[in-house]
Amino acid sequence: MAIKITPDEFSLLIQRLNKKWRVFAPSAEFRGGRFSDTDNIIYQRISGWRDLIWHEKSHMSPNTIIAPITETLFYFDKDTIQIAETDTSPIIIFARACDINAMSRLDYMYLSNGNNSDYSYQLLREHIRFVLIECEESFENCFCVSMGTNKTDCYSAAMRFSDEGALVSIRDPFIEAAIQGLGQEADYTPSFVSENRETVVTPDSVCHDPQKIRDILTHHPLWDAYDSRCISCGRCTTGCPTCTCYSVFDVAYDENPQRGERRRQWASCMVPGFSDMAGGHGFREKPGERLRYRALHKVNDYKARNGIEHMCVGCGRCDDRCPQYIKFSLIINKMTAAVRQALAEEA
């Protein structure tokens, strides 16, 4: 079923959905951007057409909804623990194909990577549905086609936006019920980006042994250049839809130090101190070493463990956000070239 709705009808649809669902979509945080006169496009709850930013790539990904930047896990009072309440009311997220594909990576990390699933993540994940925002063309720095994340069928509805409104392809009954009486029938089948200006070739395309790739790249000189270029700000990780690193710490209340709460907060493998250990020991002290660790995880180590897909989805946000204009897509191609050269020299 497909229909065409106007901006006013879209707003009415969101109002209907908001009665039961929490609806999140890319929206502008006024003057919250990198410069004083720019907005920050982040995921927020929306109430209508005017709140939605559909013509630009969001600066932050929807993982801020399902894995909040900071959250309380539980409260403690001497010998007792109380699990923090989680709002489990259902959620609808308007997202692009790359970000919907990123959810399978988060699901693996939080639900399958180890013997226990993450309690807080699982509570939210069970109640989330997606509405696909169709990309009519590739944005700057995207390389989703190379990563195989330009397409998805994991959505309840798909929408193609324009200034005149939206074409809607409906797959799930709850969307069909909410949109009842709105719009006009239309001929619409979602389409997906088939090419990007940026293209990458991952190391596993030239070598099928992830340990061999790791051995070749761990001490390769290509990382040395980033010791001076990378400033270790962590912006690439905060914008990434598949990063899952966090720190856990306790907050004791001033009134009674035996009472408090345990929180977890986003962390970054690109920031100094992330790998520090007791006794003053640390790993990856140089920026280039930290970048190597992140790059190998995104396009080698994760797939070696998962066995299905790379962690990187090619959204290009790391390239968009880097103040030093370091291109992750170029790094991937450099990694592949280094592996290809090493294999040729061994032959």
Swiss-Prot record:
Annotated positions binding [4Fe-4S] cluster 1: 230, 233, 236, 240
Domain of life: Bacteria
Short name of any one Pfam family annotated for the protein: Fer4_22
Subcellular location: Cytoplasm
Cofactor note: Binds 2 [4Fe-4S] clusters.
Keyword Transport included in the entry's annotation: yes
Predominant location category: cytoplasm
Pathway(s) the chain acts in: Sulfur metabolism; sulfite reduction
Names of required cofactors: [4Fe-4S] cluster
Binding locations of [4Fe-4S] cluster 2: 312, 315, 318, 322
InterPro entries documented for this protein: 4Fe4S_Fe-S-bd (IPR017896), 4Fe4S_Fe_S_CS (IPR017900), Helical_ferredxn (IPR009051), Sulphite_reductase_A (IPR014259)
Induction, per UniProt: By sulfite. Repressed by oxygen.
Every 4Fe-4S ferredoxin-type domain range: 219-251, 302-331
Name of this protein: Anaerobic sulfite reductase subunit A
Native organism: Salmonella typhimurium (strain LT2 / SGSC1412 / ATCC 700720)
